[in-house]
Amino acid sequence: YFLGAIPEEFGWTSTLTEPLTKEYGPIKAGIIIGGVWGVWHVIPWSWVHPVGWIAGMCLLNVLMRTAMIYAYVYGGKSLFTGLVFHTMINVTMGIFLNYGSHINTWIFSVWMAIILLSLIYFIKRESKASKC
Protein backbone atom coordinates (compact mmCIF):
# COMPACT_ATOMS: atom_id res chain seq x y z
CA TYR A 1 0.00 0.00 0.00
CA PHE A 2 2.82 2.39 0.87
CA LEU A 3 4.99 1.36 -2.08
CA GLY A 4 2.12 1.96 -4.50
CA ALA A 5 1.68 5.49 -3.16
CA ILE A 6 5.33 6.48 -3.62
CA PRO A 7 5.43 7.01 -7.41
CA GLU A 8 2.04 8.72 -7.47
CA GLU A 9 2.93 11.12 -4.66
CA PHE A 10 6.20 12.05 -6.33
CA GLY A 11 4.01 13.24 -9.18
CA TRP A 12 1.00 14.66 -7.35
CA THR A 13 2.69 16.09 -4.26
CA SER A 14 6.33 16.73 -5.19
CA THR A 15 5.82 17.91 -8.76
CA LEU A 16 2.35 19.44 -9.04
CA THR A 17 1.22 20.64 -5.61
CA GLU A 18 3.63 23.52 -5.07
CA PRO A 19 3.34 25.25 -8.48
CA LEU A 20 -0.42 24.75 -8.81
CA THR A 21 -1.07 25.92 -5.24
CA LYS A 22 1.01 29.06 -5.83
CA GLU A 23 -0.78 29.75 -9.11
CA TYR A 24 -4.37 28.88 -8.19
CA GLY A 25 -4.60 28.40 -4.42
CA PRO A 26 -5.22 25.12 -2.56
CA ILE A 27 -8.86 24.61 -3.57
CA LYS A 28 -8.39 25.03 -7.32
CA ALA A 29 -5.15 23.05 -7.17
CA GLY A 30 -7.06 20.28 -5.39
CA ILE A 31 -9.72 20.28 -8.10
CA ILE A 32 -7.10 20.09 -10.86
CA ILE A 33 -4.84 17.47 -9.29
CA GLY A 34 -7.73 15.51 -7.77
CA GLY A 35 -9.54 15.46 -11.11
CA VAL A 36 -6.48 14.10 -12.89
CA TRP A 37 -5.93 11.66 -10.02
CA GLY A 38 -9.49 10.36 -10.37
CA VAL A 39 -9.23 9.96 -14.15
CA TRP A 40 -5.87 8.22 -13.63
CA HIS A 41 -7.71 5.42 -11.79
CA VAL A 42 -10.86 5.12 -13.95
CA ILE A 43 -9.63 2.18 -16.04
CA PRO A 44 -8.59 -0.10 -13.15
CA TRP A 45 -11.72 0.86 -11.20
CA SER A 46 -13.88 0.01 -14.22
CA TRP A 47 -12.73 -3.60 -14.03
CA VAL A 48 -14.68 -4.19 -10.81
CA HIS A 49 -16.96 -1.20 -10.15
CA PRO A 50 -20.10 0.30 -11.73
CA VAL A 51 -20.11 3.78 -13.27
CA GLY A 52 -21.90 5.38 -10.29
CA TRP A 53 -19.25 4.10 -7.88
CA ILE A 54 -16.49 5.41 -10.15
CA ALA A 55 -18.10 8.86 -10.47
CA GLY A 56 -18.45 9.10 -6.69
CA MET A 57 -14.85 8.02 -6.24
CA CYS A 58 -13.64 10.65 -8.72
CA LEU A 59 -15.43 13.31 -6.65
CA LEU A 60 -13.95 11.79 -3.50
CA ASN A 61 -10.48 11.99 -5.08
CA VAL A 62 -10.92 15.73 -5.67
CA LEU A 63 -12.00 16.23 -2.05
CA MET A 64 -9.23 14.02 -0.64
CA ARG A 65 -6.57 15.68 -2.79
CA THR A 66 -7.71 19.11 -1.62
CA ALA A 67 -7.39 17.93 1.99
CA MET A 68 -3.97 16.49 1.15
CA ILE A 69 -2.90 19.85 -0.28
CA TYR A 70 -3.95 21.60 2.93
CA ALA A 71 -2.03 18.96 4.92
CA TYR A 72 0.99 19.55 2.70
CA VAL A 73 0.85 23.36 2.93
CA TYR A 74 0.20 23.47 6.69
CA GLY A 75 2.25 20.39 7.53
CA GLY A 76 5.68 21.67 6.57
CA LYS A 77 5.46 21.01 2.80
CA SER A 78 6.70 17.47 3.21
CA LEU A 79 6.19 14.70 0.67
CA PHE A 80 5.65 12.43 3.68
CA THR A 81 2.23 14.00 4.37
CA GLY A 82 1.03 12.94 0.92
CA LEU A 83 2.53 9.48 1.32
CA VAL A 84 0.88 8.89 4.69
CA PHE A 85 -2.50 10.18 3.51
CA HIS A 86 -2.35 8.15 0.27
CA THR A 87 -1.29 5.01 2.16
CA MET A 88 -4.22 5.42 4.57
CA ILE A 89 -6.58 5.64 1.59
CA ASN A 90 -5.07 2.52 0.01
CA VAL A 91 -5.26 0.55 3.26
CA THR A 92 -8.83 1.67 3.93
CA MET A 93 -9.97 0.65 0.46
CA GLY A 94 -7.97 -2.57 0.64
CA ILE A 95 -9.80 -3.83 3.73
CA PHE A 96 -13.08 -3.90 1.79
CA LEU A 97 -14.01 -6.75 -0.52
CA ASN A 98 -13.18 -5.98 -4.18
CA TYR A 99 -11.38 -2.80 -3.21
CA GLY A 100 -14.33 -1.01 -1.70
CA SER A 101 -17.10 -2.33 -3.89
CA HIS A 102 -19.51 -2.37 -0.96
CA ILE A 103 -19.01 1.25 0.08
CA ASN A 104 -21.17 4.10 -1.15
CA THR A 105 -18.66 6.56 -2.60
CA TRP A 106 -21.27 9.32 -2.67
CA ILE A 107 -21.84 9.08 1.10
CA PHE A 108 -18.07 9.04 1.64
CA SER A 109 -17.86 12.16 -0.57
CA VAL A 110 -20.44 13.98 1.55
CA TRP A 111 -18.53 13.14 4.74
CA MET A 112 -15.23 14.16 3.15
CA ALA A 113 -16.78 17.46 2.02
CA ILE A 114 -17.97 18.15 5.57
CA ILE A 115 -14.52 17.36 6.96
CA LEU A 116 -12.80 19.46 4.29
CA LEU A 117 -15.09 22.47 4.78
CA SER A 118 -14.52 22.24 8.55
CA LEU A 119 -10.76 22.11 8.00
CA ILE A 120 -10.84 25.15 5.71
CA TYR A 121 -13.06 27.06 8.16
CA PHE A 122 -10.73 26.40 11.11
CA ILE A 123 -7.62 27.26 9.10
CA LYS A 124 -9.12 30.57 7.98
CA ARG A 125 -10.38 31.32 11.49
CA GLU A 126 -6.95 30.57 12.95
CA SER A 127 -5.32 32.70 10.27
CA LYS A 128 -7.56 35.67 11.12
CA ALA A 129 -6.93 35.21 14.85
CA SER A 130 -3.15 35.18 14.40
CA LYS A 131 -3.29 38.49 12.48
CA CYS A 132 -4.88 40.28 15.44
Locate the predicted segments by residue:
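Hydrophobic core of alpha-helical transmembrane segments in multi-pass integral membrane proteins
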Residues: 108-126
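Residue-level hotspots within the lipid-embedded alpha helices of multi-pass solute transporters
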Residues: 1-6, 34, 38, 57-62, ...
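Membrane-interface helix/loop boundary segments of multi-pass membrane proteins
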Residues: 7-33, 70-78
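Short, Lys/Arg-enriched, Gly/Pro-containing loop segments at transmembrane-helix junctions
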Residues: 128-132
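Membrane-helix boundary elements
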Residues: 27-49
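Hydrophobic transmembrane alpha-helices of multi-pass small-molecule transporters
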Residues: 41, 45, 65, 90-94, ...
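Functionally important transmembrane alpha-helices
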Residues: 54-109
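Juxtamembrane helix-loop-helix connectors linking adjacent transmembrane helices
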Residues: 1-23, 46-53, 57, 98
